[in-house]
A protein has these predicted regions:
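Tryptophan-paired
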Residues: 26-57
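Extracellular structured ligand-interaction cores
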Residues: 53, 60, 86-88
Length: 165
């Protein structure tokens, strides 16, 4: 379980993370949020963080979150945006256990941040490059409260906290 958040992009229809087994295997898309989500990104530009608490299940093993996919309908037509280069946030899945991985916030910094991008850049419209930085935060105080209403079958006192690194 984790919160997937984004800040600094507008006109998004959906945002997902991509994970894969460290020792090879098929990638898995972790749907962060879409147009029907409570965290749907509005068509108005603001710097407010938007996101969604998500629960997902994977077989036991070592994984990494390595990329993201954003879809939008306002960058001159339907577009899909992904980073130019992958990043890596490893995590472990243990059989029979529910783990909280934290809040992965992908912060976009616009054209002006490209030269100083600490992690990566994406192309918008095939012409304009903007910077992003993924940041892991521990927001369990907020997330565990939300978990009780969104995922009542999960009990906070039984969830192992294993933040992404």
């Amino acid at each position: 379980m984790m919160r997937i958040s984004i800040e600094g992009l507008k006109y998004l229809n959906s945002f997902s993370l991509l994970a894969r087994p460290v020792k090879g295997g098929e990638p898995v898309k972790i749907q962060g949020w879409g147009m029907g989500s409570s965290g749907y990104w509005s068509t108005y530009y603001d710097e407010v963080e938007k996101g969604e608490l998500v629960a997902f299940s994977l077989p036991a093993g070592e994984y990494e979150i390595y990329s993201f996919v954003a879809t939008a309908s306002a960058w001159g037509g339907p577009r899909t945006v992904s980073p130019e280069k992958n990043f890596s946030f490893p995590f472990r899945v243990q059989a029979g256990e529910t783990a909280y991985l934290g809040n992965l916030l992908v912060r976009f910094r616009g054209d002006s941040g490209v030269a100083s991008a600490r992690v990566g850049t994406v192309w918008i419209d095939g012409q304009r490059k903007i910077a992003f930085e993924p940041i892991v935060r521990d927001t369990r105080s907020r997330d565990f409260k939300e978990m009780e209403s969104r995922f009542p079958e999960l009990k906070p006192d039984l969830v192992k906290v294993r933040l992404l690194k």
